[in-house]
């Protein structure tokens, strides 16, 4: 094996070096503290587990992003987690089994066989929060507000939010009695805003339903879109109108809480259609070609664990959050250099300083005081008689 092959990393897999790793860790603690202040409890999930659990209710997209291996002990297929959300849903449905609402949060590395986009990392640090047990728009407003509070904490500038609701398309598709194949084709056409294909795929439907499905292509824009949708989808089935009501309620409450936040609505945006069941949302910033935080409602995810509960939540990549955020992350700097010595009094002094939160670096055999600068030390312990004192490091 050539030397270059020993240090070469796969595409999309990166190592994080100091001080960037320290900045990410400080940000992780700050965000988890924020989540805790909202009542969200931290959970830790396995990096690898049986494939059936990882892919529950998640659709084919997650299947394609999951690295798969065979467990040498059981012979069963396992996967490295590509999304922590299904794991947290299992904790709520099967392990905790709470009757009332449950608020959970997490932060951990995930691994993607396929990146989200060409330039995306395949080893992001997924961080997010989930609220289980409440089906009202209030839960959606809470998790969206928490997501925005997280972005404010990181001081991410020029945030824009997209809002949609998969229940609108799903309700119309069911009313039209579309086959699975045609529904998927229509879904693909709507994502591309391919109006000619949408017209062709709905040509054999009753005129009113065809017109409403075609309307989803251009029902996108500002707050006025919701008023237009009320008119153009007036004859829609009750579930579609209920979805519009939910979306309007969420939008009004977000506008009241975050009056400076630009809101964009796209009723043909079906992000996570095979996974989400209600409102879907994503945050974008100029110059970044994909969402930096996203989420939505997914009420069916716990069914395979024997307990389907209403659920809504969001996630982000912590590394992206730190890269885009402008908040000052203050890292501890400097330290105290200690000579290589077996003196008992020195050891007691070192222990005391460390217990006080000081950074203390002890020289190894053969190291000279000149190595202190490389160790980022600005002070040193100097012996005066039987005592040791902290003194500035000589220039």
From Swiss-Prot:
Keywords: Amino-acid biosynthesis, Cytoplasm, Histidine biosynthesis. One of its GO terms (biological process) is L-histidine biosynthetic process. Gene3D superfamilies: Bira Bifunctional Protein, Domain 2. It holds the Pfam family tRNA-synt_His. SUPFAM superfamilies: Class II aaRS and biotin synthetases (SSF55681). InterPro entries: aa-tRNA-synth_II/BPL/LPL, HisRS-like_core, HisRS/HisZ, HisZ. Pathway: Amino-acid biosynthesis; L-histidine biosynthesis; L-histidine from 5-phospho-alpha-D-ribose 1-diphosphate: step 1/9. The keyword Cytoplasm applies. Its main location: cytoplasm. It is found in: Cytoplasm. GO terms for cellular component: cytoplasm. PANTHER family: HISTIDINE--TRNA LIGASE (PTHR11476:SF7), HISTIDYL-TRNA SYNTHETASE (PTHR11476). Heteromultimer composed of HisG and HisZ subunits. Belongs to the class-II aminoacyl-tRNA synthetase family. HisZ subfamily. Required for the first step of histidine biosynthesis. May allow the feedback regulation of ATP phosphoribosyltransferase activity by histidine. This function is generally fulfilled by the C-terminal part of HisG, which is missing in some bacteria such as this one. This is ATP phosphoribosyltransferase regulatory subunit. It comes from Pseudomonas syringae pv. syringae (strain B728a). The gene is hisZ.
């Amino acid at each position: 094996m050539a030397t270059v092959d020993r240090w070469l990393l796969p595409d999309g897999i990166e190592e994080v070096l100091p001080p960037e790793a320290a900045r990410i860790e400080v940000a992780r603690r700050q965000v988890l503290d924020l989540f805790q202040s909202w009542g969200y409890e931290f959970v830790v999930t396995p990096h690898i587990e049986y494939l059936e659990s990882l892919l529950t209710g998640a659709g084919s997209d997650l299947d394609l992003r999951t690295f798969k291996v065979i467990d040498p002990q059981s012979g069963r297929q396992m996967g490295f987690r590509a999304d922590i959300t299904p794991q947290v849903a299992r904790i709520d449905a099967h392990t905790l089994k709470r009757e009332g609402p449950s608020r959970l949060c997490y932060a951990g590395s995930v691994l993607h066989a396929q990146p989200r986009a060409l330039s995306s990392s395949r080893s992001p640090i997924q961080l997010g929060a989930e609220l289980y047990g409440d089906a009202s728009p209030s839960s959606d407003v809470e998790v969206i507000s928490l997501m925005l509070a997280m972005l404010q904490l990181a001081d991410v500038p020029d945030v824009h939010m997209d809002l949609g609701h998969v229940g609108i398309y799903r309700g119309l598709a069911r009313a039209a009695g579309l086959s699975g194949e045609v529904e998927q084709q229509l879904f693909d056409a709507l994502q591309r805003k391919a109006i000619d294909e949408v017209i062709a795929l709905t040509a054999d439907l009753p005129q009113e339903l065809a017109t409403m499905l075609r309307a989803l292509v251009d029902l996108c824009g500002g707050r006025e879109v919701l008023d237009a949708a009320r008119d153009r989808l007036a004859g829609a089935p009750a579930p579609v109108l209920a979805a519009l009501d939910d979306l309007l309620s969420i939008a009004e409450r977000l506008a009241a809480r975050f009056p400076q936040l630009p809101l964009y609505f796209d009723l043909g945006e079906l992000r996570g259609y095979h996974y989400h069941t209600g409102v879907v949302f994503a945050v974008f910033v100029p110059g970044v070609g994909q969402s930096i935080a996203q989420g939505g409602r997914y009420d069916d995810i716990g069914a395979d664990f024997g307990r389907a509960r209403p659920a809504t939540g969001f996630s982000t990549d912590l590394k992206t959050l730190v890269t885009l955020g402008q908040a000052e992350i203050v890292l501890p700097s400097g330290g105290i250099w200690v000579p290589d010595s077996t003196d008992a009094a020195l050891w007691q002094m070192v222990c005391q300083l460390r217990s006080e939160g000081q950074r203390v670096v002890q020289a190894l055999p053969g190291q000279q005081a000149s190595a202190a600068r490389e160790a980022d030390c600005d002070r040193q312990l100097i012996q005066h008689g039987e005592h040791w004192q902290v003194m500035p490091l000589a220039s």
